[in-house]
Structure formats: C-alpha cells, structure tokens
C-alpha cells in the first residue's frame, strides 16, 4: 500500500481503534495489522507521531498505568473531541469511497 494512503488513513484508524476501548501502542499496531488482513504493517515510528499529534490536538488523552506483568504502559483513550473528529473523518472517507466506487463502476463498464 502506498505511503500517502497509509498516512492519510492513520488518524481515522487510530481514533476508531480507540473508540473500541483504551489501548497502548503495541496493541494498536497489532490491531491495525489484524483489521487490514496484514496489508498495513505499522511500526513505532509510524504510530507514535500520530498519537502525539492527536494528544496535542485534544483528540486522545494518555495516562501511565501498570500492565498485568507490572510494567508501566502508556494507555491512550479517545476524548469527546476525538469522537467528533472520528465522525467527521468517517463522513469524509465515505464521500471518497462513494466517489471512487462510482468512477470505478463507470470505468469497468466502459
């Protein structure tokens, strides 16, 4: 998958995953791979800049907490503002999807 498409889809993917429940970096990376059927293989270097930007924008909040094995992890949760942003992103992506489907149907039947 192209870098531009991966970058463009990062925000709605992270927000949608956090809308399922609080999570931490490694679990988010695994969830992206799972949801994409392995087509998207994110790294720490891809995810953490997105999380930090979303945190600065107030779309996610973070807190340190102990995991089951006692190690500290930074957990992220979506905020009210993040849910509003997710709804806006969803509308935008649905418009793009509808446009592409329409043009592809015409192109395939021409």
Describe these PLM feature segments.
Residues 78-82:
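Accessory beta->alpha helical hairpin/"wing" motif in late/C-terminal subdomains of nucleic-acid enzymes
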Residues 84-110:
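Amphipathic alpha-helical dimerization/coiled-coil segments
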Residues 47-54:
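Basic amphipathic alpha-helical segments that dock to polyanions
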Residues 55-72, 77:
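Beta-hairpin "wing" of winged helix-turn-helix
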């Amino acid at each position: 998958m192209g870098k531009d498409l991966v970058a463009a889809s990062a925000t709605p993917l992270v927000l949608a995953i956090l809308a399922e429940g609080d999570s931490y970096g490694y679990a988010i990376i695994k969830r992206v791979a799972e949801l994409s059927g392995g087509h998207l293989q994110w790294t720490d270097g891809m995810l953490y800049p997105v999380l930090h930007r979303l945190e600065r924008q107030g779309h996610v909040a973070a807190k340190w907490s102990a995991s089951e094995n006692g190690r500290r992890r930074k957990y992220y949760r979506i905020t009210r503002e993040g849910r509003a942003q997710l709804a806006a992103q969803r509308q935008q992506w649905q418009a793009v999807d509808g446009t592409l489907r329409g043009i592809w149907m015409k192109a395939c039947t021409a």
